[in-house]
Amino acid sequence: VPTENVEAGRAFGCNPLQLLFKVELPLAQLYTQTPLNVPIHVIHGRRPGPVLLVSAAIHGDELNGVEIIRRLLRHSSLNRLNGTLLAVPVVNVFGFIHKTRYLPDRRDLNRSFPGSETGSLGARMAWQFKTQVLDRATHAVDLHTGAIHRANLPQIRADLSNEDTAAMAAAFGVPVVINSVLGEGTLREVAEAQGIPVITYEAGEALRFDESSIRAGVKGVLNIMHHLRMTGPRRTRAPMEPHIARSSSWVRAERDGVFLPLVALGAWLRKGQLIGRISSPFGGEDVTIESPCAGILVGRNNLPLVNEGEALYHIARFEEVREVAQNLEVFTSDIERGPGLTGEPPIA
């Protein structure tokens, strides 16, 4: 990978003992023969330690992670860093340019790992990213949002059978953790297969900035760095103990029509509670939507026009739903009312 030393961190107020490099990982060319690279920020601390990879926009339309990394790189705690931070604001540069989840051939980059040197565009990109970036890491955090028109409550998804991964999930500091299987071809699957603990942070909606989700993400990554002893003493209070979902499921539309949601993300749902309606734009009776179980609403469709079978609500089940709801209220209040960690004005 060709590397270029850029101003030894002065742009980010870095300590002289700290080295910041900007690496350009070459991928491919556009039709115009314009080279396309993935920018990677490499920050070496004052002492040896873990190598933490923080990646975003592996789906090109998931933008909250891009802003999380931008703010992270400006945070003063990096002046006292131990180990190395690898920050990749945009993995899927093709999708990012075109504001889409996918690659030009409609493949999903996060289903293309470990990839190959001679396969499709997605396979080649995955191979490059794995061999040149992921393989250098000891730990990883992958930043995501919901899909287009679908919003996620800030949550961690991780394979909790791995003790190191479970510890990272707890350290991140959001109230909801979903024990998630490792999907075939995902960055998480290939990382865990080679012994790299990795968690996925899911928050917000594609093609939208959400200030609360961004703040929680910045704070969460800093919590991970503290957990790995990459940074000094904590300046904020320790994160609350998260709640692990026993399971989760989607509520789907029973007919086509206009979807009228009646509950917000993070809502505490009771079994049988009215949570939405589907009406016809041409009149007639509404179809009511009831919660099939008690739980917390962790995902929601924000598009009013739905087809039969379309996913509407994602509900996570917990042993102590009341306690989860109370902790979510405290967490949301702290994130929304507290000052931003980088001193920047909030996105309206």
Indicate where each model-derived feature is located.
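Transmembrane helix boundary and interhelical loop/hinge segments in multi-pass membrane proteins
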Residues: 1-6
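The alpha-helix within a helix-turn-helix
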Residues: 9
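Structured catalytic-domain cores with a bias toward divalent-metal coordination
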Residues: 18, 23-348
